From Swiss-Prot:
Membrane topology category: Multi-pass membrane protein
Main location: membrane
Subcellular location: Cellular thylakoid membrane
Residues annotated as transmembrane: 11-31, 44-64, 68-88, 101-121, 146-166, 217-237, 251-268, 280-300
GO biological process: cytochrome complex assembly
Highest rank taxon of the organism: Bacteria
Pfam families attached to this UniProt entry: Cytochrom_C_asm
Source species: Synechococcus sp. (strain RCC307)
Entry function: Required during biogenesis of c-type cytochromes (cytochrome c6 and cytochrome f) at the step of heme attachment.
Keywords linked to the UniProt accession: Cytochrome c-type biogenesis, Membrane, Thylakoid, Transmembrane, Transmembrane helix
Single annotated GO MF: heme transmembrane transporter activity
Subunit structure: May interact with ccs1.
Taxonomic lineage from the root: Bacteria, Bacillati, Cyanobacteriota, Cyanophyceae, Synechococcales
Entry protein name: Cytochrome c biogenesis protein CcsA
Length: 311
C-alpha cells in the first residue's frame, strides 16, 4: 500500500511508475482495437509496455542489490516478477505478430499484478526480508525464476486463446494451418495471369493467427513448467530429503501441468484447433490463479507468501 515516505523507497516508486505506464497503455490498446488500427497508436502502446518492462527490470535489480538475494522472496516481489515476465512475453509475441489484439488481450494481466502488489498488499509483504535458511540455495534462482516465467508464458498464451473465443462469434471457425506448423497446410488459390497459372497463398485469418500464437506460447510455458517442477523436486530432496511432499503448491502445480498437457495432447494427438483447445487453455487460467495466488494467500505450506492465516 502507499506510504508517506514513498520517495524514499525506489522499489515501490518504480513499481508505481510501471503501473502508470501500463494504466496508460491499456485504454489505448482497447481504443486501437475498437476501430481501424493506427500504427502510431500501436507504437505508443508498445513503447509504454517497453517502459513498464524496463521499470520493472530496474525495480527488481534494485531490490536484488538492496536485499542481497534474488527478488522473489515475498508476494510483492513475486507479483512484480510475474508482471515483468508477462510484459516480456507480450513484447516477444508482438515481434512475431504486431497486432493490436496482443496488447489488448495481455496487458490487463500485467496491470492487475502490479496493481495488486502496489495497492493491496500490507507493508510487511512489500518490504524486503531475509531469506529463511532453506531458501539460501543456488536453486532459488533456477527453480523460482523458471516457474514464474512458465506462469507468464502460460497466462499470455491462455489469454490469446481466450481471444480466439471472441473472434468470428456465431460462425464456424475454419483453421487451415496445422498445430505443429505455421500455415504449411493452408489452402492455396489458383489465378491466371495472361494464360499462366499462378499459385497464390491464402491469407491467414485472424483466428488462425491467434490460435497458432497461443499454441506456441503455451508450448514454451509448458516446457518451462516441466523444468521448474523437476528442479523444484531436486531442490526439495536436497533441502528436506523428499522429492515430493504433496504440499498445496506442489499439488496445484501438478494439476496445472496436467491441464496444459491435456491441451497439447488434444492438439497434437486429436488434431483439435480453434475453440475446443481454447476452452482447455482458458480453464488453465483458473488453475494458475489457484496455484499462484490462492495457495499463497491461504498461508499454508512451504510455498506460501500469504497472511490470511498467519499468526
Amino acid at each position: 500500500m502507499l506510504m508517506p515516505g514513498l520517495l524514499n523507497d525506489p522499489v515501490l516508486l518504480l513499481g508505481l511508475m510501471a503501473f502508470g505506464a501500463l494504466l496508460l497503455a491499456l485504454p489505448l490498446a482497447f481504443w486501437n482495437l475498437s476501430g481501424e488500427p493506427r500504427s502510431s497508436t500501436s507504437r505508443v502502446v508498445q513503447l509504454l509496455v517497453v517502459a513498464a518492462n524496463l521499470l520493472l527490470t530496474a525495480q527488481l535489480l534494485w531490490r536484488w542489490l538492496d536485499s542481497g538475494h534474488f527478488p522473489i522472496s515475498n508476494l510483492y516481489e513475486s507479483l512484480c516478477f510475474l508482471a515483468w515476465g508477462c510484459t516480456f512475453t507480450q513484447l516477444f509475441v508482438e515481434r512475431s505478430w504486431p497486432s493490436p489484439l496482443v496488447p489488448a488481450a495481455t496487458t490487463p494481466m500485467a496491470l492487475v499484478c502490479v496493481a495488486f502488489a502496489s495497492f493491496a498488499l500490507p507493508d510487511t509483504l512489500q518490504n524486503a526480508a531475509p531469506l529463511v535458511p532453506a531458501l539460501r540455495s543456488s536453486w532459488l534462482v533456477m527453480h523460482v525464476s523458471v516457474i514464474m516465467m512458465s506462469y507468464a508464458a502460460l497466462l499470455v498464451g491462455s489469454l490469446l486463446s481466450a481471444a480466439v473465443l471472441f473472434t468470428q462469434p456465431g460462425q464456424a471457425m475454419e483453421l487451415r494451418s496445422s498445430s505443429i506448423g505455421s500455415g504449411s497446410f493452408q489452402k492455396a488459390g489458383l489465378q491466371t495471369d495472361g494464360g499462366t497459372v499462378v499459385l497464390e497463398a491464402a491469407p491467414i485469418a485472424l483466428s488462425e493467427r491467434l490460435d497458432n500464437l497461443s499454441y506456441r506460447t503455451i508450448t514454451v510455458g509448458f516446457l518451462l513448467l516441466t523444468v521448474g517442477i523437476i528442479s523444484g523436486a531436486v531442490w526439495a530432496n536436497e533441502a528436506w530429503g523428499s522429492w515430493w511432499s504433496w504440499d498445496p503448491k506442489e499439488t496445484w502445480a501438478l494439476i496445472c501441468w496436467l491441464v496444459y498437457a491435456a491441451y497439447l495432447h488434444t492438439r497434437l494427438s486429436r488434431g483439435w484447433q480453434g475453440r475446443r483447445p481454447a476452452w482447455v487453455a482458458v480453464s488453465g487460467l483458473f488453475v494458475i490463479s489457484v496455484c499462484y495466488i490462492g495457495v499463497n494467500l491461504l498461508g499454508i505450506g512451504l510455498h506460501s507468501y500469504g497472511w490470511f492465516f498467519d499468526s
